[in-house]
Amino acid sequence: MPTEIYVDGASAGNPGPSGIGIFIKHEGKAESFSIPIGVHTNQEAEFLALIEGMKLCATRGYQSVSFRTDSDIVERATELEMVKNITFQPFVEEIIRLKAAFPLFFIKWIPGKQNQKADLLAKEAIRLNEKN
């Protein structure tokens, strides 16, 4: 069964202080991460959430991963391995590079209300960002 990873990025301003939330469910255990990422746009934060989630899974040696995001641009760019807005191209290139670590890689768009844990973690990361 694939490891499930819920990712979300948030920004207090566009751009503004930003954070990412990552919620991982692996073999009956759950891990939560709130990571401040400095000043970014909301869409940049969404891409960075996926990238950081992929890095966490790769370092843990997970082979089969299923990511969930409420960002349709991140889901589409990852599936198509391209993006119309060249601003996001470096993120897509990093995602393509990281995908090679996983024999089975899935990504699925979900409505925001199904991604509440990652959303709360991302908002907490903004608060942590603002404290520093």
Swiss-Prot record:
Disulfide bonds, paired cysteine numbers: none
GO terms, molecular function: metal ion binding; nucleic acid binding; RNA-DNA hybrid ribonuclease activity
Binding site for a divalent metal cation: D8, E46, D70, D119
Sequence similarity: Belongs to the RNase H family. EbsB subfamily.
Every RNase H type-1 domain range: 1-127
Protein name (Swiss-Prot/TrEMBL): 14.7 kDa ribonuclease H-like protein
Pfam families: RVT_3 (PF13456)
UniProt keyword Cytoplasm present: no
Name of the gene this protein is made from: rnhA
Signal peptide as annotated in the record: none
InterPro entries from the UniProt entry: RNase_H-like, RNaseH-like_sf, RNaseH_domain, RNaseH_sf
Entry keyword set: Metal-binding
Role, per record: Not known; does not have RNase H activity.
Organismal lineage: Bacteria, Bacillati, Bacillota, Bacilli, Bacillales
Ranges in coiled-coil conformation: none
Provenance organism: Bacillus subtilis (strain 168)
Known cofactor(s): a divalent metal cation
Keyword Transcription regulation found: no
